[in-house]
Amino acid sequence: MYQRVLLKVSGEVFGGTKGGLDYEAITEVAKQIADANELNINIGVVVGGGNIIRGIDADRFGVLRTTADYMGMLATVINSLALQSVLEEKFGIHTRVQSAIPIASVAENFIRRRAIRHLEKGRIVIFAAGTGNPYFSTDTAAVLRAIEINADIMLKATKVDGVYDKDPKKNSEAVKYDEVSYREVLDKQLKIADSTAIALCMENHLPMMVLDIFVPGNVKNAILGKKVGTLICECKK
């Protein structure tokens, strides 16, 4: 069983089928976190902002890329506050939101040692605003935070059940990997996370597991070491 994990939840998950904030979807994510929290382990969370805005998309409509990325960071703060509220009010779990950009009225500034102290006290820490810098994805931010808090693994929770050799939505013959190496993900350009995030995992020996957040018990089972989704690792065979 993993003792400290970083859960990355894509922003699209929070949008459900409607986009924006789908509170049924957010509650489902919170329930999975609450179930995992019963294992008395340390849990950090990073939420994307794609349900509200994607910086890389806004750039195409005439918004300066750096500005668009900051807009995306603020979107992750909105999602983080929504998740915090549901975790505390519905499930009674103590949480802290730490932001990579100063926003003192609603969140703590990210301070590594304080984050670790919160985790040690059994609080769930939600890391908002990405890395605080434009041109970096929330996947990269999640890997960075996982490394900084000495997480055993990063769980990437999405709407798909793992990593495939081809896009399963476009190709019925796509094959799912149970386990795949960082190098293979990079060499084959498998579209599960950006290359910066994967390279950072590889350099720091951080395993990443890709799973479907909407399968009940998936997060808890992954933490328990059960076979869930796809494991991206050094995979020495």
Region spans (language model):
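C-terminal catalytic "cap/lid" subdomain
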Residues: 1-237
